[in-house]
């Protein structure tokens, strides 16, 4: 103990409290922070194994069937505008924002430091990419550490 830089008495400590103590010592981020990854994917390529939450947005109109949008992706403004032009898309997005805003403090309370939110559509190119981008923007505006990954957005390109 005399030569230790840190000493943690774990005799009456839960594992989550130990985790919080260790993170507070060795990480620059406070224990109430979380890294959130928003992933878009195509169901035809499989659900990401690392996903904590998976949302299926195939219920929304598909830009794939609009000739001028087919070759674009949810990273393009025209596609995002099209996807979000429907009341059903706007309602779903609002409900998902509300759900995630509710869940994050619950996960933080349980000591979760990483959260992976996955959005899936048929090919992972249009609707899921739009929703992943929008969720990442929403989380960032709320001062949360969020990043976006588009797993399948380029899979069908030749």
What annotation goes with each model-predicted range?
Residues 39, 120, 149:
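Residues in well-ordered beta-strands of folded domains
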Residues 112, 132, 148-150:
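Long, positively charged, glycine-interspersed low-complexity recognition regions
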Residues 114-136:
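Catalytic cysteine-centered active loop of the rhodanese-like fold, especially the PTP/DSP P-loop
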Residues 136-146:
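Post-Walker A helix-loop "phosphate-sensing" segment adjacent to the P-loop in P-loop NTPases
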Residues 144-155:
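Short beta-strand-centered segment that lines the nucleotide-binding/catalytic pocket of NTP-utilizing
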